[in-house]
Swiss-Prot record:
Disulphides: none
Localization (cell): Virion
Role according to the record: Displays methyltransferase, positive regulation of the poly(A) polymerase and transcription elongation activities. Involved in the modification of both mRNA ends and in intermediate and late gene positive transcription elongation. At the mRNAs 5' end, methylates the ribose 2' OH group of the first transcribed nucleotide, thereby producing a 2'-O-methylpurine cap. At the 3' end, functions as a processivity factor which stimulates the activity of the viral poly(A) polymerase OPG063 that creates mRNA's poly(A) tail.
Main location: virion
Complexes and interactors: Interacts with poly(A) polymerase catalytic subunit OPG063. Interacts with OPG109 and OPG123; these interactions might help linking transcription to capping and polyadenylation.
Annotated protein name in UniProt: Cap-specific mRNA (nucleoside-2'-O-)-methyltransferase
Annotated family: Belongs to the class I-like SAM-binding methyltransferase superfamily. Poxvirus/kinetoplastid 2'-O-MTase family.
GO MF, one annotated term: mRNA (nucleoside-2'-O-)-methyltransferase activity
GO cellular component, one term: virion component
Gene coding for it: OPG102
GO BP terms in the entry: 7-methylguanosine mRNA capping; methylation
EC number assigned by the record: 2.1.1.57
Catalytic activity: a 5'-end (N(7)-methyl 5'-triphosphoguanosine)-ribonucleoside in mRNA + S-adenosyl-L-methionine = a 5'-end (N(7)-methyl 5'-triphosphoguanosine)-(2'-O-methyl-ribonucleoside) in mRNA + S-adenosyl-L-homocysteine + H(+)
Length: 69
């Protein structure tokens, strides 16, 4: 198997439905209430992203190997 190099990721999140779901104020948030809340949020966002790909049929016929954070 030959490695493949690409200029950008396969797909950006906003390319699925042309919506950018980013709140610029999130950079100014206060510290989290418990130490691993950020990792939990990241995991939930990753799962949400995969489910969104599935709902739009982008993953049809694909095998997904998920290596999470």
């Amino acid at each position: 198997m030959e490695p493949l190099s690409i200029d950008k990721p396969f797909m950006y999140f906003d390319e699925i439905n042309n919506e950018l779901e980013y709140d610029p104020d999130s950079a100014n948030e206060k510290h989290k209430k418990f130490p691993y809340q950020g990792q939990l949020k990241l995991l939930l966002c990753e799962l949400f992203f995969l489910s969104k790909l599935q709902r739009h049929g982008i993953l049809d016929g694909s095998t997904i190997v998920y290596i999470g954070s």
